[in-house]
Amino acid sequence: MRIPSTQALRALVSFARHGTVWQAAEELNLTRSAVSHQLRMLERDLDFHMLDRVGTRVELTAQGRAYADDVRQALLAISGSAFAITFPWPGND
């Protein structure tokens, strides 16, 4: 197992939110091919099946949805921490 890239994790979260590679690509300002590639690399790096592919349709498995939710929460926590140190409140040293 390799630690996944943040770009791949963001692609997963966006895909989970929108349900399509096309909408995830629009949100991330990437091509559909780039998002699909990130999702494939994420599965490879984790050695974990999280996507079901039927023809051209791609859907998250139940475990994939659970992982995407965990990743979303982790990215929000990282973003919140970055905001807190960048814009500290008085007395919150």
Where in this protein do the model-derived segments appear?
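Short alpha-helical elements of helix-turn-helix
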Residues: 1-18, 36, 65-68, 72
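Short helix-boundary/capping micro-motifs
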Residues: 13-29
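Helix-turn-helix DNA-binding elements, focusing on the entry/boundary residues of the two helices
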Residues: 20-21, 39, 53
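Residues within the DNA-recognition helix of helix-turn-helix
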Residues: 31, 38-41
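A short LG(V/I)-centered, amphipathic sequence patch enriched
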Residues: 43-60
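A short, exposed helix-loop element centered on a Lys and neighboring polar residues
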Residues: 79-83
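Interdomain hinge and pocket-entrance segments immediately C-terminal to HTH DNA-binding domains
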Residues: 86-93
